[in-house]
C-alpha cells in the first residue's frame, strides 16, 4: 500500500506523517517513509538528524546507480520505520517531480520499492504543479492534512482537485482529511458538507505535538518518558487502523474557487448565522430521531 500525504505548507504534514508511520509499524507493518521536500526534514523526528538525500547521494556517485547500496540512502528510524529523503533540485532550478521519479527509480533498482507493506510519501506544501503531484502517480491513497482555518481548507480543496485529476488514469482514492492541532472542527465540517469526504481524525490542540518536532522525536517516543501522552498516540493508531482496513475512499469533486471562498469567508464574516444554521440542523436531526 502506498500513501501520499499532502496539505498546506507548515500545517504539520511531516509531524503527522512520522507519527502515522510509527502507528503503522506498531500494527506490525514494515513501513518506509519518503520525504519529498527540498528541505529534507520529513524524517527528522524519526531519525533525530537530517539524513543525506537521494539526490545528494546520486550526485556523489556521478549518477551511477550501480554504485549505490541500500544503506547509502535508507536509514533506520525510531520504531523500525525506514526513512528516505528524496531531496530536491537547486532553488529556482529543476523540477521536484523529476526528483521523486529518480527516487522511485533508484529504490526499484535496489529492489526496495516492493519490500514494504506501506510506503508513505510526505510531500511539500500545496500542489502547485504537476511535478509535485508526481507522488500521486504511485499512491493508492491520498491523505490531506488541514486545520480548522480558511487557508488550509482552501489548499485542501486544490489538492482534492489534483486527486480527482490523477484518478482519471490511476487507481487513486482520497482516504480523507486529518485535522491537525485544532480545538474546533466547525469549518472542516462546513467544507466536508460542500465537498463530501471522510474525516479520519481531528488531533487535539496541544503544544506537545509542535514541541515533538523541535525535539526531533515522535509522540510515541516522547510517551515512553511521558505516559500522559499515550492518549494522543491513540489518535494516530486510529488513523493507521482506518488506513489498514483499505477503505473505499472517494474521488472528490472540488468546490469551485469562488464558491469555496464565499462559503468559508461567510463563515468568518457571519459567524452567528452560520452557527445558528448548524444548530438548527442539529435540532432538526434530533426531532427526526425522536
Swiss-Prot record:
Binding of ATP, residues: 10-15, 39, 180-181
One Pfam family here: Fer4_NifH
GO cellular component: chloroplast
Residues that bind Mg(2+): 14
Protein role: Component of the dark-operative protochlorophyllide reductase (DPOR) that uses Mg-ATP and reduced ferredoxin to reduce ring D of protochlorophyllide (Pchlide) to form chlorophyllide a (Chlide). This reaction is light-independent. The L component serves as a unique electron donor to the NB-component of the complex, and binds Mg-ATP.
Assembly and interaction partners: Homodimer. Protochlorophyllide reductase is composed of three subunits; ChlL, ChlN and ChlB.
Protein's UniProt name: Light-independent protochlorophyllide reductase iron-sulfur ATP-binding protein
E.C. numbers: 1.3.7.7
Gene3D superfamilies: P-loop containing nucleotide triphosphate hydrolases
Annotated localization: Plastid, Chloroplast
Reaction equations catalysed: chlorophyllide a + oxidized 2[4Fe-4S]-[ferredoxin] + 2 ADP + 2 phosphate = protochlorophyllide a + reduced 2[4Fe-4S]-[ferredoxin] + 2 ATP + 2 H2O
Amino acid at each position: 500500500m502506498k500513501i501520499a500525504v499532502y496539505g498546506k505548507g507548515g500545517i504539520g504534514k511531516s509531524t503527522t506523517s512520522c507519527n502515522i508511520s510509527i502507528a503503522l509499524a506498531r500494527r506490525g507493518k514494515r513501513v518506509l517513509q519518503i520525504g519529498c521536500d527540498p528541505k529534507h526534514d520529513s524524517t527528522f523526528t524519526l531519525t533525530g538528524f537530517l539524513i543525506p538525500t537521494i539526490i545528494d547521494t546520486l550526485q556523489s556517485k556521478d549518477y551511477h546507480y550501480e554504485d549505490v547500496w541500500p544503506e547509502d540512502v535508507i536509514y533506520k528510524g525510531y520504531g523500525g520505520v525506514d526513512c528516505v529523503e528524496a531531496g530536491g533540485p537547486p532553488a529556482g532550478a529543476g523540477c521536484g517531480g523529476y526528483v521523486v521519479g529518480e527516487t522511485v527509480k533508484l529504490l526499484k533498482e535496489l529492489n526496495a520499492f516492493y519490500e514494504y507493506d506501506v510506503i508513505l510519501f510526505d510531500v511539500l506544501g500545496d500542489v502547485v504543479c504537476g511535478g509535485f503531484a508526481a507522488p500521486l502517480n504511485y499512491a493508492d491513497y491520498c491523505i490531506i492534512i488541514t486545520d480548522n482555518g480558511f487557508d488550509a481548507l482552501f489548499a485542501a480543496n486544490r489538492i482534492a482537485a489534483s486527486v480527482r485529476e490523477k484518478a482519471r488514469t490511476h487507481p487513486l482514492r482520497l482516504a480523507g482529511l486529518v485535522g491537525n492541532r485544532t480545538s474546533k472542527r466547525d469549518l472542516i465540517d462546513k467544507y466536508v458538507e460542500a465537498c463530501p469526504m471522510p474525516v479520519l481524525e481531528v488531533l487535539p490542540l496541544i503544544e506537545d505535538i509542535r514541541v515533538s518536532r523541535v525535539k526531533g522525536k515522535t509522540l510515541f517516543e516522547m510517551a515512553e518518558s511521558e505516559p500522559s501522552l499515550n492518549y494522543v498516540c491513540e489518535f494516530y493508531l486510529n488513523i493507521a487502523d482506518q488506513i489498514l482496513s483499505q477503505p473505499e475512499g472517494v474521488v472528490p469533486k472540488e468546490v469551485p474557487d469562488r464558491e469555496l471562498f464565499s462559503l468559508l469567508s461567510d463563515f468568518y464574516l457571519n459567524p452567528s448565522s452560520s452557527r445558528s444554521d448548524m444548530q438548527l440542523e442539529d435540532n432538526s436531526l434530533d426531532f427526526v430521531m425522536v
